[in-house]
């Protein structure tokens, strides 16, 4: 077994490692936490022990035992590394901002073994804005999710494995098949920053899709100075800005960030750049700041002082995907029942109606066989898919359904209103909801559209041309591409989303692609031109990209043949009018089941898994099933050929795995769905791989079709899988 030399503060220590589960960067979001708990459940029959251990900066004692004192009965050694200062990922305390709400209502963002109300322990928000809404339909404030994840991690004794402020900078694969991690440890005192290297046998990455902010660099206008750095921030930094300037207290009753002694600095003008859901939230927050909503937890604002409404300039470029569609907070089920909109989306009913779900229509097909012909006839696919998507009449009615939804959501928002200077027309989404690439969100803030329609909100459909400083003040001057210059602005917030790559250096460079991860490569390589031959890039990277190009071409032909019109966006989709200007682009993730690298699968290597590289409206419903699949893969549970109703990954050829991965990538590209998945369809596939039934609701076909799948539908799947495989 490997030994680790950890270098820090001029001293060397030697530790013993059996397994190191690393989930880095945002490990402590949903995916990382449930992965750690599930892996320990699968590998250690005594987990969780009753012993409660708190987080420490030390290496666990089990790492210090000499090699010859370890036995096969020792507990699994496990570490969870986090570059931030607290757990929670998106819901970490340092990332919360005043009106941050989950896109999930109560019951949909929790683990199956512990409800959100259990973690609250009687604590409630004195300023909660939706007390008249039934509890099960309330959208969850960010602070509650932060508190929930902390309580749940304590229940499963996870703090003892956590290491905060440990940033993984480099990952290498050694000839011994170990993983080498270069780490920078950032303590509270910058002068104490140190570097170290550790080794591990098994590695899980769970940074998710929101780890690297997409920060745009704006040049100043000619003859003007650059804008002050503190006046141009990303949406990720809004929470710290609110703590410093408005006395924001993220967790009610917890004085971790006391109100500032200096007077609060309420901005006069704020500019917000972007059209995704986060931009809607930020516009709402600043537009209603003068109302001093107690649910914002702004302790720096004196309740007796009058505050002028903040002038909010909302800038959305005129090209690209446009503003997001915003669903009403409640929607109707087929039986007429009105429930939270996110719960409607967590039913099979919506999945089968969506053209974004790759459901094969029922059909006869030829499959390879061991008989003398080498082929056999087989029936595959879904009758519902044949009825709804496999014929012109079905597609017509599906299209009518989504067009009716367009009108319903548009009427709710008031896009056609001639009032307010017609500014609501600027927020009309570019494409229909039926287009899989259309950005979506839920208008779950109180008085959401009223705040947007208010006279202190100004909407501009143009790109930012330049951002400059002002010599006589600390404000910024923003020039737009349509020749508009905004009034002097105190704060520019980039609600520009996230980059799709993992923020770690992999060595050698081709390792990134070999692990199935996204890699920043020259655009000319991804879209070959005559000049592509002149682009300097690692030969192995170029070889891998061209290898996948050939497979993708075959996959595209097959998908168009099987899915017909559903394999492409509707004819009325408006393409982006903004030509790409960056000479680099990110290659797609190529992960089998969105988790494992095809190259490692072929080699029989069960040491690496990536989690959270799926885009879904119901993260918690996916996370628990993904975690079990990952644990099964890492421990050889998917190599078992004795269970005939489960996946035997050893029985799959490399070409089978590559075809599956390629079709997943090509489907995302052709339809516009990208990394998005239909939650229940994806979970069904993983559960079938594990030999478990995907149908968890019972009560017959209609009940299965219309019931809301919450995480509790998957309660007990770890024990169910262990029993099926004879594991203690």
From Swiss-Prot:
One of the record's GO molecular function terms? monooxygenase activity
Parts of the chain that traverse the membrane: 17-37
For this protein, the Enzyme Commission number is 1.-.-.-
Q: How does it sit in the membrane?
A: Single-pass membrane protein
Q: Which Gene3D superfamilies match?
A: FAD/NAD(P)-binding domain
Q: Which cofactor does it need?
A: FAD
Pathway the protein acts in: Secondary metabolite metabolism
Q: What class of enzyme is it?
A: oxidoreductase
Q: What are the binding positions for FAD in this chain?
A: 168
Residue segments, region Disordered: 50-72
- Cite the binding residues for NADP(+): 490-491
Which Gene Ontology terms of cellular component type are present? membrane
User: In which compartments does the protein localize?
Assistant: Membrane
UniProt keyword Transmembrane present: yes
Question: Per UniProt, which keywords does this protein have?
Answer: FAD, Flavoprotein, Membrane, Monooxygenase, NADP, Oxidoreductase, Transmembrane, Transmembrane helix
User: Spans of biased composition, class Polar residues?
Assistant: 50-64
Q: Which family does it belong to?
A: Belongs to the FAD-binding monooxygenase family.
Its biological purpose:
Multifunctional FAD-dependent monooxygenase; part of the cluster that mediates the biosynthesis of a highly modified cyclo-arginine-tryptophan dipeptide (cRW). Within the pathway, avaB uses the avaA cyclo-arginine-tryptophan dipeptide (cRW) as substrate to generate the cyclo-Arg-formylkynurenine diketopiperazine (DKP). AvaB also catalyzes an additional N-oxidation of the avaC product which is followed by cyclization and dehydration.
Protein's UniProt name: FAD-dependent monooxygenase avaB
């Amino acid at each position: 077994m490997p030994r680790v030399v950890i270098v820090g503060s001029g001293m060397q220590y030697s530790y013993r490692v059996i397994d190191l589960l690393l989930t880095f960067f945002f490990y402590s979001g949903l995916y990382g936490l449930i992965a750690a708990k599930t892996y320990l459940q699968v590998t250690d029959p005594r987990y969780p022990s009753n012993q409660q251990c708190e987080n420490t900066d030390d290496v666990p004692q089990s790492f210090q035992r000499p090699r010859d004192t370890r036995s096969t009965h020792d507990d699994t050694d496990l570490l969870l590394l986090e570059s931030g200062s607290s757990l929670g990922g998106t819901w970490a305390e340092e990332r919360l901002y005043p009106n941050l709400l989950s896109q999930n209502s109560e019951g949909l963002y929790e683990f199956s073994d512990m409800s959100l109300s259990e973690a609250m322990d009687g604590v409630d928000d004195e300023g909660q804005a939706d007390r008249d809404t039934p509890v099960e339909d309330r959208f969850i404030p960010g602070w509650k999710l932060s508190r929930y994840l902390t309580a749940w991690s304590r229940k499963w004794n996870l703090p003892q494995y956590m290491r905060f402020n440990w940033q993984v900078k480099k990952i290498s694969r050694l000839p011994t098949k170990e993983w080498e991690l270069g780490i920078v440890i950032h303590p509270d005192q910058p002068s104490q920053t140190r570097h170290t290297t550790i080794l591990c046998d098994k590695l899980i990455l769970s940074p998710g899709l929101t780890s690297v902010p997409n920060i745009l660099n704006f040049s100043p206008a000619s003859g003007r100075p650059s804008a002050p750095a503190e006046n141009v921030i990303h949406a990720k930094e809004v929470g710290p800005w609110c703590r410093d300037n408005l006395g924001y207290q993220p967790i009610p009753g917890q004085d971790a960030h006391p109100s500032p002694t200096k007077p609060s600095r309420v901005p006069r003008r704020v500019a917000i750049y972007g059209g995704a859901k986060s931009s809607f939230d930020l516009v709402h927050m600043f537009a209603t700041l003068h109302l001093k909503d107690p649910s914002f937890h702004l302790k720096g604002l004196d309740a007796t002082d009058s505050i002028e409404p903040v002038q909010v300039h909302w800038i959305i470029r005129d090209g690209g995907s446009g503003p997001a569609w915003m669903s009403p907070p409640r929607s109707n089920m087929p039986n007429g029942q009105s429930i939270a909109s996110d719960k409607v989306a967590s039913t099979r009913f919506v999945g089968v109606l969506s053209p974004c779900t790759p459901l094969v229509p029922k059909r006869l097909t030829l499959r390879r066989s061991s008989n003398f012909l080498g082929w056999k006839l087989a029936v595959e696919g879904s009758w519902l898919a044949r009825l709804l998507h496999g014929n012109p009449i079905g597609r017509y009615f599906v299209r009518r359904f989504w067009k009716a939804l367009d009108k319903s959501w548009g009427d709710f928002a008031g896009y056609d209103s001639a009032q307010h200077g017609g500014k609501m027309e600027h927020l009309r989404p570019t494409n229909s909801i039926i287009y899989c690439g259309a950005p979506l969100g839920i208008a779950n803030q109180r008085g959401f559209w009223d705040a947007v329609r208010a006279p202190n909100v100004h909407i501009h459909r143009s790109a930012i041309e330049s951002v400059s400083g002002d010599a006589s003040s600390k404000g910024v001057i923003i020039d737009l591409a349509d020749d508009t210059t905004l009034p002097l602005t105190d704060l520019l917030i980039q609600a520009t989303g996230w980059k799709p790559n993992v923020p770690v250096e992999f060595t050698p460079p081709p390792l990134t692609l070999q692990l199935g991860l996204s890699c920043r490569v020259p655009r000319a390589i991804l879209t070959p031109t005559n000049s592509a031959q002149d682009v300097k890039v690692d030969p192995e990277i170029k070889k891998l990209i061209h290898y996948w190009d050939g497979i993708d071409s075959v996959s595209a032909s097959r998908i168009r043949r099987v899915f017909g019109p559903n394999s492409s966006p509707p004819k009325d989709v408006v393409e982006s009018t903004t030509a790409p200007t960056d000479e680099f682009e990110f290659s797609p993730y190529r992960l089998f089941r969105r988790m494992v690298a095809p190259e490692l699968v072929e080699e029989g290597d069960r040491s690496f898994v990536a989690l959270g590289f799926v885009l879904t409206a119901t993260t918690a419903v996916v996370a628990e099933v993904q975690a079990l699949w990952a644990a099964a893969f890492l421990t050889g549970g998917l190599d078992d050929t004795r269970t005939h109703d489960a996946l035997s990954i050893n029985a799959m050829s490399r070409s089978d795995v590559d075809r599956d991965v390629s079709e997943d990538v090509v489907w995302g590209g052709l339809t516009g769905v990208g990394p998005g998945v239909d939650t229940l369809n994806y979970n069904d596939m993983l559960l079938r791989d594990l030999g478990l039934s995907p149908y968890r609701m019972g009560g017959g076909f209609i009940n299965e079709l219309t019931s809301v799948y919450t995480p509790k539908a998957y309660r007990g799947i770890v024990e169910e899988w262990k029993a099926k495989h004879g594991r203690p």
